[in-house]
């Protein structure tokens, strides 16, 4: 059983780029990157890359805007590929993905940089301040500064990781 699971994990790892890396997305052009990892691709029969252009339902968005093209959905989840040892922090695909993440999701706050989970996130209160009821507006998550600090540390940038730790601490209430 262990061999089967190891072989399956190796096969999946070998397909990550086919399943989730796009080189023709608008965000790459906008950020000056060669490509980026997308948040999720729906199961599509046939060619794996076809899924990167399929529609994905984001359930915490209002029904009129719930569907978004997979290649338009950028997420900080990409950093997990480095944290889990599946990609090196200096892998050009990771470096370009971080460039896109910063272009799309980074927001400068009084405490320092912050990141939203993904573009179009609807988890949060509404624009008028009313509470989340299944849809809303996604905001910056202080915890994501800590996740970015992990990446910076693995990339050998201890000073930046320490700065991001201070950003996360300053964001607490």
Predicted regions and their residues:
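Extended ligand-binding clefts on enzyme/binding-domain cores
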Residues: 2-142, 156
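C-terminal hydrophobic structural anchor segments
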Residues: 129-173
């Amino acid at each position: 059983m262990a061999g089967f699971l190891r072989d399956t994990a190796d096969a999946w790892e070998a397909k990550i780029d086919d399943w989730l890396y796009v080189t023709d997305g608008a965000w790459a052009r906008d950020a000056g990157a060669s490509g980026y990892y997308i948040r999720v691709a729906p199961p599509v029969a046939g060619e794996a890359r076809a899924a990167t252009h399929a529609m994905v339902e984001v359930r915490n968005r209002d029904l009129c805007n719930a569907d978004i093209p997979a290649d338009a959905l950028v997420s900080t989840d990409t950093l997990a590929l480095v944290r889990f040892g599946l990609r090196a922090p200096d892998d050009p695909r990771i470096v370009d993905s971080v460039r896109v993440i910063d272009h799309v999701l980074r927001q400068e706050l009084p405490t320092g940089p912050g990141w939203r989970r993904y573009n179009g996130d609807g988890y949060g209160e509404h624009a008028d301040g009313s509470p989340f009821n299944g849809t809303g507006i996604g905001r910056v998550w202080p915890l994501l500064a800590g996740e970015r600090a992990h990446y910076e540390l693995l990339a050998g940038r201890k000073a930046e990781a320490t700065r991001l730790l201070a950003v996360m601490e300053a964001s607490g209430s």
